[in-house]
């Protein structure tokens, strides 16, 4: 080992002939040589060595990258241990995929130009000794350099579904293989088929090279143009050191430090595997951080960011220790068991790779549970607010009579195992509280809680579908509450929380309802249908208001009432619905099947005078009456001439109820009991030409 000539990759480092090098930590020692510049120049032989080649790989492993750059195992270990700072094209070694679920293909262009070497018979006769010479920690001298240049075009897809990574990678590789033979037209545009263009538009390009470019390529088309120009850019003056030959210093100075030993291949493989496994965990963490669900839950985002930082810190400490051990082994102060012990200690720590991957599995499960719930909830189109200040501002809105809030109650930024990792980083000699995350510390590791959360999400969605109105607002948020497992549907009435496990609105019997808010659960916004309105009715305010008494030219429409001064609403209703209207004059409000007559002057076309319609009517002459199938019954009202009428349709129960509305309270007036067979349309009678009375209504 001490007398062996070393051959190492330059990796963008500024090697020159005669330069000193410490192979124990793979460091250049600039500013010192064994010979004067004139002697080196006179003793240098140069031979032409032109070559060029390209290679394509679809791997991101350190081994494959090192193979492209002709890096041997010992130097690779130094790089992984952080001993070597690379430059130029070798920065490609530091370029790692951000996401695990990402396709990558790399194109390498490699060229050599010349080989320079110092004459082997130079010996020690021209060595310039000095007082500083004895203190220089160099093990080798540079005696040969192969010049040339490397260029790497790194093509990355966007983050994709894990099942598509290989397929997309294959498509990318097939197109990139064509780069060396792609033709460029006179307009310098790349000639590709339509399908190939679609593929290339979906990925990005990053360039690492020993060539000076005014701008680096970022797209496939840029990469093709740059690749075509590289051979013309290659020349003697543009070449950089690529491979370096080193002679031990002891050949010139017997007291020089020596490279006594190096780690065996199995140990170096452990270095690589351990560090690459941590990188894989970090990519997995990046995948999670990029998930849209994580962007919603700041607590989950915080945990993942903390975990990522912890892994970074652990990696840095591990690399620093590996660097020290490599130097000690190469200096002969320790044997390779020192590195072996380091990895054994790592296996017995909470930072063993199995534990790190287990934590990520738990966190990915949490994200999957949250995503599955959000997929259900978003179909209800709720306001998703994870800032509690903004949430309560929304709850205090005067328009919000009722609010249902789906609350994730177990989402928290606190994590027992992250605390263990942090404590071990601070005190690596201490005994860790646990070596791996425990399922009992994670609520989502049990099936029953996520299942209940999804059941509540479906309930919430169905409630939103049933009560999609102005008075009931729906929110989604996260409020940590260990006493409520998984999630709850919290009910707020006029900003006050009433219950935290809501299932359905409390509705008294229709005759006993007194609180207006109970009816507003089923608030329904209606619009009058101008195509049904009798010709003397004038609609305004967005077809919310109708007034009788105006004469206008008759129009013939199949849906229009020709004899009775009536108008219907645009949509048929089933389910539960409540609406309010201001009314005055001679008016009636009710519902009808769509098939009510329109053109006759008989009862078939008159609201309340047939089996198809139900009407609550008011006139100053007759007072209040309920009418169905021509049967009239007077209704006693405590406040004659009230202005605000409420109507509640419970289609499934077969009831249609009318209420006098007074601010926060309602007074029951009458309820029709029947069995509805089809959707009903709110409809109104407004004025009577024969009695020469007018009326008006306004939907609220």
UniProtKB/Swiss-Prot annotation:
- Describe how it is modified after translation: Intrachain disulfide bonds may be present in the heterodimer. Not glycosylated.
| Segments for region (Structural MACPF/CDC pore-forming domain) | 2-264
Annotated B30.2/SPRY domain ranges read 506-700
Predominant location of this chain? secreted
GO CC annotations on file: extracellular region
Does the keyword section mention Nucleotide-binding? no
Q: Which InterPro entries match?
A: B30.2/SPRY (IPR001870), B30.2/SPRY_sf (IPR043136), Butyrophylin_SPRY (IPR003879), ConA-like_dom_sf (IPR013320), Cytolytic_pore-forming_toxin (IPR052090), PRY (IPR006574), SNTX_MACPF/CDC-like_dom (IPR056072), SPRY_dom (IPR003877)
The record's subcellular locations are: Secreted
Expression across tissues: Expressed by the venom gland.
For this UniProt record, the keywords arranged alphabetically read as follows: Cytolysis, Disulfide bond, Hemolysis, Ion channel impairing toxin, Myotoxin, Neurotoxin, Potassium channel impairing toxin, Secreted, Toxin
Q: Region labeled Structural FAT domain — which residues?
A: 265-384
Record GO biological process: killing of cells of another organism
Q: Which GO terms describe its molecular function?
A: potassium channel regulator activity; toxin activity
Annotated spans, Thioredoxin (THX) domain: 385-514
- What does this gene product do? This lethal (towards mammals) heterodimer induces hemolytic activities due to its ability to form pores in the cell membrane. The pore may be composed of 10 SNTX-alpha/beta heterodimers. The toxin elicits potent hypotension which is endothelium-dependent and appears to be mediated by the nitric oxide pathway and activation of potassium channels. In addition, it displays edema-inducing activities, increases vascular permeability. It also shows myotoxic activities and interferes irreversibly with neuromuscular function.
Q: How does it assemble?
A: Heterodimer of alpha and beta subunits; non-covalently linked.
Instruction: State the name under which the record lists this protein.
Output: Stonustoxin subunit beta
Look up and give the organism this protein is from. Answer: Synanceia horrida (Estuarine stonefish)
């Amino acid at each position: 080992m001490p007398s062996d000539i070393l051959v190492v990759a330059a990796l963008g480092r500024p090697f020159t002939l005669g330069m000193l090098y410490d192979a124990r930590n793979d460091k250049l020692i600039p500013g010192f040589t064994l010979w004067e510049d004139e002697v080196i120049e006179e003793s240098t032989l140069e031979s032409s060595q032109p070559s060029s080649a390209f290679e394509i790989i679809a791997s991101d492993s350190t081994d494959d990258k090192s193979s492209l750059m002709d890096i041997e195992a010992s130097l690779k270990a130094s790089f992984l241990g952080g001993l070597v700072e690379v430059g130029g094209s070798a920065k490609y070694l530091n370029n790692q995929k951000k996401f695990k679920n990402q396709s990558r293909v790399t194109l390498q262009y490699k060229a050599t130009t010349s080989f320079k070497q110092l004459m082997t018979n130079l010996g020690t006769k021209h060595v310039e000794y000095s007082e500083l010479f004895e203190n220089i920690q160099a093990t080798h001298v540079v005696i040969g350099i192969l010049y040339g240049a490397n260029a790497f075009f790194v093509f990355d897809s966007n983050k994709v579904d894990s099942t598509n990574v290989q397929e997309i990678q294959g498509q990318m590789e097939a197109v990139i293989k064509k780069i060396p033979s792609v033709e460029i037209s006179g307009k310098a545009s790349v000639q590709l088929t339509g399908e190939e263009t679609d593929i290339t538009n979906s990925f990005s390009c990053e360039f690492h090279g020993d060539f000076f470019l005014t701008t680096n390529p970022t797209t496939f088309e840029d990469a093709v143009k740059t690749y075509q120009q590289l051979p013309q850019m290659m020349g003697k003056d543009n070449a950089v050191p690529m491979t370096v030959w080193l002679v031990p210093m002891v050949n010139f100075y017997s007291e020089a430090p020596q490279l006594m030993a190096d780690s065996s291949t199995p140990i170096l493989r452990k270095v690589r595997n351990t560090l690459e496994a941590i990188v894989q965990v970090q990519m997995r963490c990046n995948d999670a951080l990029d998930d849209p669900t994580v962007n919603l839950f700041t607590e989950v985002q915080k945990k993942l960011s903390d975990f990522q930082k912890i892994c970074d810190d652990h990696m840095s400490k591990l690399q620093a220790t590996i660097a020290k051990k490599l130097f000690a082994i190469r200096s002969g102060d320790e044997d390779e068991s020192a590195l072996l012990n380091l990895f054994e200690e790592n296996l017995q720590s909470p930072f063993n790779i199995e534990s790190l991957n287990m934590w990520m599995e738990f966190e990915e499960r949490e994200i999957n549970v949250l995503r599955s719930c959000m997929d259900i909830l978003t179909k209800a189109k709720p306001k998703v607010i994870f800032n509690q200040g903004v949430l309560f501002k929304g709850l205090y809105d005067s328009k919000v009579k009722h609010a249902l809030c789906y609350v994730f109650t177990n989402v928290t930024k606190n994590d027992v195992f992250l605390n263990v990792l942090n404590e071990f980083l601070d005190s690596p000699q201490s005994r860790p509280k646990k070596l791996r995350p425990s399922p009992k510390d994670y609520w989502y590791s049990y099936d029953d809680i996520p299942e209940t959360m999804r059941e509540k999400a479906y309930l919430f969605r169905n409630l939103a579908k049933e009560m999609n109105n102005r008075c009931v607002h729906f929110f989604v948020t996260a409020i940590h509450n260990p006493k409520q497992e998984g999630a709850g549907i919290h009910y707020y009435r006029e900003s006050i929380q009433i219950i935290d496990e809501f299932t359905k609105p409390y509705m008294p019997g229709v005759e006993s309802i007194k609180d207006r808010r109970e009816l507003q659960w089923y608030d329904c916004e209606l619009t009058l249908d101008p195509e049904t309105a009798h010709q003397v009715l004038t609609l305004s305010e967005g077809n919310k208001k109708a007034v009788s008494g105006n004469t206008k030219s008759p129009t013939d429409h199949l849906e229009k009432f020709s004899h009775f001064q009536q108008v219907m609403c645009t949509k048929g209703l089933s389910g539960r619905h409540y609406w309010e209207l201001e009314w005055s004059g001679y008016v009636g409000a009710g519902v009808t099947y769509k098939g009510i007559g329109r053109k006759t002057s008989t009862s078939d076309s008159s609201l309340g005078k047939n089996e198809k319609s139900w009407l609550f009517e008011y006139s100053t002459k007759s007072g209040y009456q309920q009418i169905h199938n021509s049967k009239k019954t007077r209704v006693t009202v405590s406040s004659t001439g009230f202005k605000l009428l409420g109507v509640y349709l419970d289609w499934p129960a077969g009831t249609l109820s009318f209420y006098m509305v007074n601010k926060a309270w309602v007074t029951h007036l009458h309820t029709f009991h029947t069995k509805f067979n089809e959707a009903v349309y709110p409809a109104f009678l407004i004025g009577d030409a024969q009695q020469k009375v007018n009326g008006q209504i306004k939907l609220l």
